[in-house]
Curated annotation (Swiss-Prot):
Keyword annotations of the record: Cytoplasm, Hydrolase, Nuclease, Ribosome biogenesis
Localization (cell): Cytoplasm
Protein name: Putative pre-16S rRNA nuclease
Main location per the UniProt record: cytoplasm
Listed GO biological process terms: rRNA 5'-end processing
Annotated GO CC locations: cytosol
EC number of this enzyme: 3.1.-.-
Reported function: Could be a nuclease involved in processing of the 5'-end of pre-16S rRNA.
Source species, domain of life: Bacteria
GO molecular function: nuclease activity
InterPro entries per record: RNaseH-like_sf, YqgF, YqgF/RNaseH-like_dom, YqgF/RNaseH-like_dom_sf
Annotated family: Belongs to the YqgF nuclease family.
Amino acid sequence: MPLFNPHDLRNLLQSGQRVLGLDPGSKTIGVALTDVSLMLASPLIGLKRRKLGENAQELAKIVRTQDVGALVVGLPLSLDGSFGPAARAASDWTQALSEKLGIPAGLWDERLSSSAVNRFLIKDADMTRGRRAEVVDKMAAAYMLQGWLDASRPEAPEIF
């Protein structure tokens, strides 16, 4: 299944369907979900990173129960915006997961999303390191997914 740009992916959604956002890390996959009006992304859970098939089974339950119509995965571009080995791996992983889940997918730049969330949790939320570790992945997924939502709105210019 091909990967879609934000506007095309949004246009594939049926009314009332949600979008699932993933921020895959080496140990944890942050999971976020949009509301049905596609205005707001909220953190959902952090999944332990396992083999693709195992994670796909866990995510398939969310897809079914939450009426998810599309998947957006964080793309770890290099700081200069180039498409390096990590971005290639994320793209391949996203395509494979999209096929397993049977829903269309797209990628969205996740550069510095975890850093931005960590800064917020330290400065504004005054969270301890242990508590931050519990929530940073799912919050980074929500941060990334909100960026995708904002860019994919019909009035937003096409940038991808």
